[in-house]
C-alpha cells in the first residue's frame, strides 16, 4: 500500500486466522514509508544483481496484453513471475501463481507457456527491447514454475 494507485490488498487468506498478521501490521501503518524504503532498496538491488538493472527496469516495455497474444498466453505475467522467482527465490509463490493461469478466469487471466507457439509469438514481441531473449525466458519459466494446476484459495478444500 505504498503506492497511491493501490487501494486493495489481496492477502490470500483462506481462513479467518490468516488475517491475524495483517491486522497486527496495522500498528505500523503510520511508519510505512520509512519502513518500506530500505527493504525495497535491498530487494531491488538483489534483483539488479541477479538479473541485471536493464532487465529489471525495462522488462515490461513493449509487451502485449494477453488478449493480443496467440492462444492468450499471459506473457507479461509470466515474465513478472519469472523475474521475482529467479531474482528473489520466490519459486513456491511463482509456482502457485503460474499454475493458476488458465484456471482462474478473469481473476488471473490468460494461459501459461504450455500453450505457446513460439513461431506465432515473435511478431507480438517485436516492440520489446528483450524480444530475442523472451522466448528462452518463457521456456525457463515454464520449466521452473509449472506443476499441478492450482485452484484459487477460496476454491480449495484446505
Which residues fall in each region the model found?
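Structured C-terminal cap/extension of enzyme domains
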Residues: 1-158
Amino acid at each position: 500500500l505504498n503506492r497511491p494507485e493501490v487501494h486493495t490488498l489481496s492477502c490470500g487468506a483462506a481462513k479467518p486466522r490468516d488475517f491475524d498478521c495483517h491486522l497486527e501490521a496495522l500498528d505500523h501503518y503510520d511508519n510505512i514509508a520509512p519502513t518500506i524504503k530500505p527493504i525495497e532498496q535491498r530487494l531491488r538491488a538483489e534483483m539488479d544483481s541477479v538479473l541485471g538493472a536493464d532487465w529489471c527496469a525495462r522488462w515490461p516495455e513493449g509487451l502485449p496484453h494477453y488478449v493480443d497474444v496467440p492462444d492468450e498466453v499471459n506473457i507479461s505475467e509470466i515474465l513478472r513471475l519469472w523475474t521475482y522467482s529467479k531474482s528473489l527465490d520466490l519459486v513456491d509463490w511463482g509456482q502457485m501463481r503460474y499454475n493458476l493461469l488458465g484456471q482462474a478466469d478473469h481473476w488471473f487471466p490468460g494461459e501459461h507457456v504450455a500453450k505457446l507457439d513460439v513461431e506465432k509469438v515473435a511478431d507480438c514481441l517485436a516492440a520489446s527491447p528483450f524480444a530475442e531473449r523472451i522466448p528462452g525466458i518463457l521456456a525457463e519459466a515454464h520449466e521452473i514454475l509449472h506443476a499441478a494446476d492450482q485452484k484459487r484459495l477460496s476454491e480449495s478444500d484446505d
